[in-house]
Amino acid sequence: MSERGGAFSCGAELTALPDGVRRVADVLQQSGHPHTPVMLADAVRTAQQAADALGIAPGQIAKSIIFRRQSDDAAVLVITSGDRRVDEKKVDALVGTTGRADAAFVKARTGFSIGGVSPVAHAQPPVTLIDRELFRFDEIWAAAGHPQGVFKLRPQDLERLTGAPVADVVEHTAS
């Protein structure tokens, strides 16, 4: 692997990667996405940690947050900017009443552990919403199926890869 700052490029060593990262890499390759996942030197569990490791603003981290829809037990994925908090009332208005998803639900539905949930390559396709705040940036980074795995993309790529609508799903502070 070749080192790039705090990250290591995966390149041709895809078979040596964790299963989740390989799944994400396969989806990215099949879709013609120009970037492959990279493995960070250390696991990152927060948007701030990921941003620090990559040398970018926290808002450039695309956080993948899973909720559990109450009516049918479906997984609801909200992909939001790392410097924003999801407004659950806005999400509920768009997809129906949701609740928090525990680690077992997240792993069963996505195939990923919390801290490594990717916006793509889920075990079962979730209902997905994309935070419009991500479009403030030309370049963003998302988890690639492992707490150390990330990949680079544009917000428009996220929209194309997921087929999800872009919506106002975050809390706004009074100015």
Language-model segment annotations:
Residues 1-175:
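Extended, low-hydrophobicity, polar/charged segments
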